[in-house]
Every structure is written in structure tokens, then in C-alpha cells.
Amino acid sequence: MSLNAEQKAKVVLEHGSSAHDTGSTEVQVALLTLRINDLQKHFLEHKKDHHSRRGLLRMVSQRRKLLDYLKKRNISKYTDLIQSLGLRK
């Protein structure tokens, strides 16, 4: 259910400015999106797992806050990130 180091490194290289750029907003949003997608697959099988659902809602909220921050700071990076991750506005 959690991401392994290879998956994280791939996301950091794809969305970050360098291989060690784990703190940028774009990388954080991309990592949260991967974790959210993994949890959505988990809920297809475990519909009554309410404890994990709370964590999912927390991650979605955190991603929304980061996206709002990015939208205020740099609209072009925001639109590029939304398109590359396949998210709605």
C-alpha cells in the first residue's frame, strides 16, 4: 500500500528540479497523488475500512492545500502539474 523507494525516486526525478528535490510543492503533490490512488484501489476491496478512509481524506485535503498554494504562487506550474497528473481543477 505504501510507496517504495524506487517509485518515490521516479516521481522526484519527474516532477522535481533535481534528484534530491523532495520538498518542492510539485513533488509533494505528485507523491500524495500516488498514495491517494493506491488507497482508492484498497477501498475497492475493503469498503468498510473507515480508519484508512480518514487518512485518505486527510491526504486529499493536504493535496488541495498544496495545490491552492501553488496556484497562488505560480499558475503556469500549477496548470502543468494538473495536466501531468490528470487532476481536475
UniProtKB/Swiss-Prot annotation:
A Pfam family it matches? Ribosomal_S15
Read off the Gene3D superfamilies from this record: 6.10.250.3130, S15/NS1, RNA-binding
Keyword Ribonucleoprotein recorded = yes
InterPro entries for the chain:
Ribosomal_uS15, Ribosomal_uS15_bac-type, uS15_NS1_RNA-bd_sf
Entry-linked PANTHER family: RIBOSOMAL PROTEIN S15, BACTERIAL AND ORGANELLAR, SMALL RIBOSOMAL SUBUNIT PROTEIN US15M
Q: What family is reported?
A: Belongs to the universal ribosomal protein uS15 family.
Record's subunit section: Part of the 30S ribosomal subunit. Forms a bridge to the 50S subunit in the 70S ribosome, contacting the 23S rRNA.
Protein's name in the database: Small ribosomal subunit protein uS15
Q: Give the organism's phylogenetic lineage.
A: Bacteria, Pseudomonadati, Pseudomonadota, Gammaproteobacteria, Enterobacterales
